[in-house]
A protein has these predicted regions:
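PAPS-dependent sulfotransferase catalytic core
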Residues: 288-334
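An acidic/histidine-cluster motif and surrounding catalytic segment
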Residues: 2-149, 153-291
Length: 334
């Protein structure tokens, strides 16, 4: 039924947005480029997002597909070894980093839990590297603004109207023009709401507390700033919240780009075991796993690519201390 509804939307008349297109003939800057992050092994998603983009025209009447460039995503399956820290990625973060963005008033973790290093999952590292790659593309471009999309998005009803209203309010205020490095158009607020200040009727500035990077407008100056702030420490949508104080971040009054629910996510969320230990699985529900494991140790064997990383994540959520993706046991475990 969900897929049928998504297909039926495409029978509606195409919409036009004054925010997209070449800006040489416009009163204020426009979004001149769209980047879609897409894995080489998922061409069907690229086809779907292209169909989505064809439903919207820029201010001149051209399809948004004409402004769109596919950016090949980094594939975690191609990592030959666990990625190490480099100039772009620091693959360790802490529970304290997470709770700064999304506090959990019911949970009382001790200092040891707060400061323990959490390794990013390989898919999280791949996602971060993909976004960083697009930032470099934007920073080197001649375009003032670019829309960055992940390949599982869809434009919600009223997308063009809400975006045009926000864009007009941002740029049509004379000396009080709202400047931004990042404009979130797809996001989820933390459970208790993001602390924010409304700059206009359709635009607010968050202090922190916005999840997802599935759809956002990035300025060239914003891309340059993000690259200067590297390395990314933790999942990229978490890390970027920690940079809000040094960036001009805005968001549309509500999320106007959604993520499709009819595709399988390949991400592994490294924070889940730590949230489980303090009694929280995610922002929606309390942990069900409070009993310490009765059987130990547990060994699991399988060929590469058979899902051992996912099994280790599941065992961690059940309270086990895990070593995974190893060819031999570390000396400390013998």
């Amino acid at each position: 039924m969900y897929r049928i509804v998504m297909e039926c939307r495409r029978l509606l008349p195409r919409r036009r947005s004054q925010t997209f297109g070449l800006s040489s003939s416009k009163e204020w800057p426009t979004i001149e480029r769209i980047y879609v992050i897409n894995l080489d092994r998922q061409p069907d998603r690229w086809v779907e997002v292209r169909r989505e983009l064809r439903q919207i025209m820029d201010w001149s009447g051209a399809e948004l597909g004409d402004l769109t460039e596919r950016f090949p995503a980094v594939d975690a399956r191609l990592f030959e070894q666990w990625p190490l820290k480099d100039e772009d990625i620091d693959p360790f973060y802490t529970l304290a980093d997470q709770l700064l963005v999304e506090p959990q008033p019911q949970a009382l973790p001790d200092r040891l839990e707060l400061d323990r290093h959490i390794p990013m999952s390989q898919p999280e590292i791949a996602v971060a590297r993909s976004h960083i790659g697009v930032w470099r593309r934007v920073a080197k471009s001649k375009h003032s603004y670019a829309l960055i999309l992940e390949d599982d998005v869809w434009f919600q009803p009223g997308f063009t109207r809400h975006l045009d209203e926000a864009w007009r309010e941002i740029h049509a205020q004379g000396d009080k023009t709202i400047k931004f490095d990042i404009l979130y158009v797809s996001y989820k607020e933390v459970k208790y709401g993001a602390q924010k200040t409304f700059l206009s009727r359709s635009v607010f500035r968050p202090v922190r507390g916005l999840w997802f990077l599935s759809g956002y407008v990035l300025s060239r100056e914003g891309a340059e700033k993000l690259l200067r702030f590297l390395p990314c420490r933790g999942p990229v949508d978490l890390w970027i919240n920690h940079q809000f104080g040094a960036l001009d971040v805005c968001a549309t009054r509500r999320s106007i780009i959604g993520q499709r629910r009819d595709g399988n996510s390949t991400n592994l969320y490294s924070i889940l075991p730590s949230l489980t230990k303090i009694g929280v699985i995610d922002s929606e529900s309390a942990s069900l796993f409070q009993v310490r494991p009765a059987e130990r140790p547990v060994f699991a064997f399988g060929p590469q690519g058979s899902g051992l990383s996912s099994l280790a994540m599941a065992l961690s959520m059940l309270g086990y201390r895990c070593c995974s993706d190893l060819d031999e046991l570390p000396t400390l475990e013998l």
